[in-house]
């Protein structure tokens, strides 16, 4: 990458570039720099305009190197099988067209709930080189993003769903892949039921969450249960694709990350009947809110949630 700096009264400039397994610090009298950064990932750039070594002004910003790597490198990560023994593929979107297929997806617009900051807009979702690209922007504190669902266009009861995605992980980001009961418009939440296939709350520990929500008819209160998987390197969630899956039947839901099981929850109880009905698919990137907290100076904008495919299978 090439960087040019300028500042009135500066005698020289310095830039420090840091990322996973990478660090480079250079000085320049004319403010021109060149860095050869090959690993994909997120980098922090710190630029200083010096009068003397200890008298300077400083500017920091973040670079998501995924935006400029090759197509081959961009697609790195786990890929799930196209088929499974004993299952039929009943619905899929490979995002291979020039635009989002509106026979599959609805665009939700407006402000969301959970004290989130973003305004959902259709314009923040598009197809880019065979991937769904959901963009979270934060220009001047005016946060925008996108949320898509398949309500009234596709829903299913029981089976397996695989979603291959690359998600943003900086502070305040809340990417989610989830299912909501098709009865939502008639009986509202949580009576309709909710199955969260994947949520990431922009936290530093790399926890990928799976959760279910329902209305407990025995006590009239909301029911919640779930768990999480700690990944070894949270930056890989944004630099590599992973496949987020559940296998769901009338008795239990099993969560998988890259086809490795990490969570099981039983749903056969009488008061959990809404978790055994038809559900539709939702993909979204929220910003801020009750779970991830608000963005800060380390947050990366624009942030991208890329989805390679969504595939739904049911037993023969």
What are these regions (language model features)?
Residues 22-29:
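Short beta-strand segments within Ig-like beta-sandwich modules, predominantly Fibronectin type-III
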Residues 50-56:
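Short, solvent-exposed loop/turn segments at the edges of extracellular beta-sandwich modules
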Residues 1, 12, 35, 40-49, ...:
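GH16 jelly-roll
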């Amino acid at each position: 990458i090439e960087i040019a700096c300028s500042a009135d009264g500066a005698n020289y400039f310095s830039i420090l570039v840091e990322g996973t397994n990478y660090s480079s610090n250079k000085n320049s009298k004319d403010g021109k720099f060149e860095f050869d950064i090959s690993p994909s990932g997120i980098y922090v750039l710190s630029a200083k305009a010096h009068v003397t070594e200890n008298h300077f002004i400083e500017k920091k910003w973040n670079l998501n190197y995924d935006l400029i790597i090759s197509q081959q490198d961009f697609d790195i990560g786990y890929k799930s099988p196209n088929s499974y023994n004993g299952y039929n593929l009943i619905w899929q979107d490979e995002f291979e067209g020039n635009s989002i297929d509106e026979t599959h997806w609805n665009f939700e617009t407006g402000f969301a709930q959970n004290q989130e900051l973003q305004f959902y807009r259709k314009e923040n979702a598009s197809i880019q080189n065979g991937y769904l690209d959901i963009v979270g922007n934060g220009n001047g504190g005016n946060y925008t993003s996108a949320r898509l669902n398949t309500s009234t266009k596709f829903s299913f009861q029981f089976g397996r769903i695989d979603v291959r995605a690359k998600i943003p992980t900086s502070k305040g980001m809340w990417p989610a892949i989830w299912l909501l009961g098709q009865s939502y418009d008639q009986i509202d939440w949580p009576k309709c039921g909710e199955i969260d296939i994947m949520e990431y709350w922009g936290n530093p520990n790399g926890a990928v969450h799976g959760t279910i929500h329902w209305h407990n008819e025995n006590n009239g209160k909301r029911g919640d249960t779930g768990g999480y998987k700690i990944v070894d390197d949270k930056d890989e969630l944004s630099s590599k694709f992973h496949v987020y899956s559940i296998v769901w039947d009338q008795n239990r839901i099993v969560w998988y990350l890259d086809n490795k099981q990490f969570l099981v929850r039983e749903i056969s109880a009488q008061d959990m009947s809404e978790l055994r009905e038809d559900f539709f698919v939702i993909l979204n990137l929220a910003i801020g809110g009750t779970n991830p907290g608000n963005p800060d100076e380390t947050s990366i904008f624009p942030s991208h949630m890329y989805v390679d495919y969504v595939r739904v299978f049911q037993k023969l």
